[in-house]
């Protein structure tokens, strides 16, 4: 069965244009609804320590973008929820599945966040299912995102447990080495895995990992994603919390994976690595460029909104999209 699945990734696909029906790309609507909220773009900066902190989260929320705060400053999560609610902003946090997280979730009853993401590397597990059920019992109004997974069976099981959305992607990210360390994952066929999982889904799918260009966002939506989580494209900005490093007169920001020894603080069960990225400028400029490029994608799709991307045809051009050019 598995060997019958078409295997391809982002660089192997080109979308086929339809007749344009808008006079300017600025007429294209890139907004997306998740739960009871509408956001400006279908993108989420990865919930990683070198991508997002409280300041970046607040900026994103103020500007109408979705965000997920990482879970690695555990004692700061509850004050963060209060801070966001005091400012009239949505609170979106991450939790793990260890025993103490159950008490933490229960403690949120008086000030429940709008979104909770259960964030572990291998999300198709009883521990995630039990945490979904616990959150839904304690905080029934909270939107639960669960992951990460890579199969239709996992999507169905997490949805049946009560997840409101599932996050698809096992190790396709730029600083993730799961496929090398374990032999498992969706690295190299993330887009095909997304297509496979979305066919089984009844609720939103969040594509997580493997995004290298803005065009990959449109491709993700074409193959079933409601939103797209992105790491490396959001790393390295002036506002990014990664450490600033100077090498031969050029400034770089650190970017490391959520299962790296740099994040974990120990050399144990490491599935991530650290790299240096040239400082890119302001996050706001990248978000604006993403929106403009996605508006262009919608115009090529022959529509006015994101849904038009779901209906375009495509061709598989194995590894030839760059024609030898680097990106």
Curated annotation (Swiss-Prot):
UniProt-recorded name of the protein: GMP reductase
Encoding gene, per UniProt annotation: guaC
Residues forming coiled coils: none
SUPFAM superfamilies listed in its UniProt record: Inosine monophosphate dehydrogenase (IMPDH)
Active-site residues annotated for this sequence: 176 (thioimidate intermediate)
Organism: Streptococcus agalactiae serotype V (strain ATCC BAA-611 / 2603 V/R)
Keyword NADP attached: yes
Domain of life: Bacteria
Family label: Belongs to the IMPDH/GMPR family. GuaC type 2 subfamily.
Function: Catalyzes the irreversible NADPH-dependent deamination of GMP to IMP. It functions in the conversion of nucleobase, nucleoside and nucleotide derivatives of G to A nucleotides, and in maintaining the intracellular balance of A and G nucleotides.
GO molecular function: GMP reductase activity
CDD domains per the UniProt record, alphabetical: IMPDH (cd00381)
The reaction(s) this protein catalyses: IMP + NH4(+) + NADP(+) = GMP + NADPH + 2 H(+)
């Amino acid at each position: 069965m598995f060997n019958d699945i078409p295997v391809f990734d982002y660089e192997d696909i080109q979308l086929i244009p339809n007749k344009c029906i808008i006079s300017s790309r600025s007429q294209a609507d890139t907004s997306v609804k998740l739960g009871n909220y509408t956001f400006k773009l279908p993108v989420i900066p990865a919930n990683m320590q070198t991508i997002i902190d409280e300041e970046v989260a607040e900026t994103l929320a103020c500007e109408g973008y979705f965000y997920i705060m990482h879970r690695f400053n555990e004692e700061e999560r509850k004050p963060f929820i209060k801070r966001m609610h005091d400012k009239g902003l949505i609170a979106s946090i991450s939790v793990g599945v260890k025993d103490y997280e159950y008490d933490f979730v229960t403690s949120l009853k008086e000030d429940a966040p709008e979104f909770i993401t259960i964030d572990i590397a291998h999300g198709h597990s009883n521990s995630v299912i039990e945490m979904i059920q616990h959150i839904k019992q304690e905080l029934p109004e909270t939107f639960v995102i669960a992951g990460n997974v890579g199969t239709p069976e996992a999507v169905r099981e997490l949805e049946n447990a009560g997840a409101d959305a599932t996050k698809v992607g096992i190790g396709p990210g730029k600083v993730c080495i799961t496929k090398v360390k374990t032999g498992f994952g969706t690295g190299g066929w993330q887009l095909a895995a997304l297509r496979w999982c979305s066919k089984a889904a009844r609720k939103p799918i969040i594509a997580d990992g493997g995004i290298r260009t803005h065009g990959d966002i449109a491709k993700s939506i074409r193959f079933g994603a409601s939103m797209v989580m992105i790491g490396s494209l959001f790393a390295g900005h002036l506002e990014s919390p990664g450490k600033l490093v100077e090498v031969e007169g050029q400034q770089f920001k650190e970017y490391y994976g959520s299962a790296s020894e740099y994040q974990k603080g120990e050399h144990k069960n490491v599935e991530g690595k650290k790299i240096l990225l040239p400082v890119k400028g302001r996050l706001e400029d990248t978000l604006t460029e993403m929106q403009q490029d996605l508006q262009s994608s919608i115009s090529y799709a022959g529509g006015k909104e994101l849904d038009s991307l779901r209906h375009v045809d495509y061709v598989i051009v194995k590894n030839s999209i760059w024609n030898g050019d680097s990106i």
